[in-house]
């Protein structure tokens, strides 16, 4: 990952292979980039190639024991909530696939702009047999209309960018070649607003959501681990990893 500056706007580029899968190293780098935002007044996060972020790095995680996996998922939750609570506006420029953890990452942004291209967006955890961590559910409930929760969370549907716009996952959809310019322009417009009031309103909106996400994180985390380590899910995960390695 790397960070660039465009005046008052910081641009965070995820560069972790062609899928931008979420590994322990990517989480630490992302957390470090947050520290580097400095005096930026808005930020844009995007991926590369055909992927914004294709989710958790399953090949690196599937053989972890429960204790180690617990540490990873807790760190994942900490980082996504830190992004959710950023004091400055964050724009997700979703350039391609945003699946499972990748969709979760995009959902932490204030504004999500998608590229109108062939891509899959959504939370397919239930199709593998995994639950959704408590913090993910809290932010999802807050970010999308209630009518979208069944297809996204319960059915685990992966949808096209146009369907993502209809479901409220995206706020805007633009031609692929215009994505970054549009996201940077939206961020610059937000950066031009008086910062004190903007930060106060964002904090007031998001603080109760983050508090609810943390309230039952430990209990919900153990329930999530139960689904991850169930025999059926482990079998499905290993089948998925086998396909990814081909």
What does each of the following model-derived ranges do?
Residues 99-153, 182, 186:
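CoA-thioester-processing core
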Residues 114-119, 170-218, 243-246:
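C-terminal long alpha-helix characteristic of the crotonase
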Residues 55, 73, 77, 100, ...:
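Glycine-rich phosphate-binding loop at the start of an alpha helix
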Residues 1-48, 67, 81:
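Conserved CoA-thioester-binding segment of acyl-CoA-metabolizing enzymes
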Residues 39, 47-79, 212:
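Glycine- (often His-adjacent) and acidic-residue-rich active-site loop
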Residues 93-94, 124:
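Structural motif
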Residues 111, 151, 155-157, 163, ...:
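Well-ordered beta-strand positions
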């Amino acid at each position: 990952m790397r960070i660039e500056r465009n005046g008052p706007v910081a641009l965070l580029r995820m560069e972790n292979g062609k899928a931008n899968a979420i590994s322990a190293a990517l989480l630490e780098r992302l957390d470090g980039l947050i520290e580097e935002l400095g005096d930026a007044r808005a930020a844009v996060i995007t991926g590369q190639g055909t992927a914004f972020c294709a989710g958790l790095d399953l090949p690196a995680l599937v053989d972890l024991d429960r204790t180690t996996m617990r540490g990873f998922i807790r760190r994942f939750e900490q980082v996504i909530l830190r992004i959710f609570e950023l004091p400055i506006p964050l724009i997700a420029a979703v350039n391609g696939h945003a699946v499972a953890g990748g969709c979760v990452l995009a959902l932490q942004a204030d504004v999500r702009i998608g590229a109108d291209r062939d891509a899959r967006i959504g939370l397919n955890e239930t199709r593998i047999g995994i639950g959704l961590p408590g913090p993910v559910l809290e932010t999802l409930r807050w970010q999308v209309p209630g009518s979208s929760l069944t297809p996204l969370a319960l059915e685990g549907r992966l949808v096209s960018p146009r369907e993502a716009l209809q479901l409220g996952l995206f706020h805007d959809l633009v031609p692929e070649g215009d994505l970054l310019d549009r996201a940077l322009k939206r961020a610059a417009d937000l950066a031009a607003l008086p910062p004190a009031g903007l930060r106060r309103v964002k904090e007031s909106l998001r603080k109760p959501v983050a508090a609810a996400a943390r309230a039952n994180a430990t209990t919900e985390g153990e329930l999530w681990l139960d689904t991850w380590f169930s025999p059926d899910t482990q079998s499905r995960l290993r089948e998925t990893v086998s396909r990814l390695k081909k």
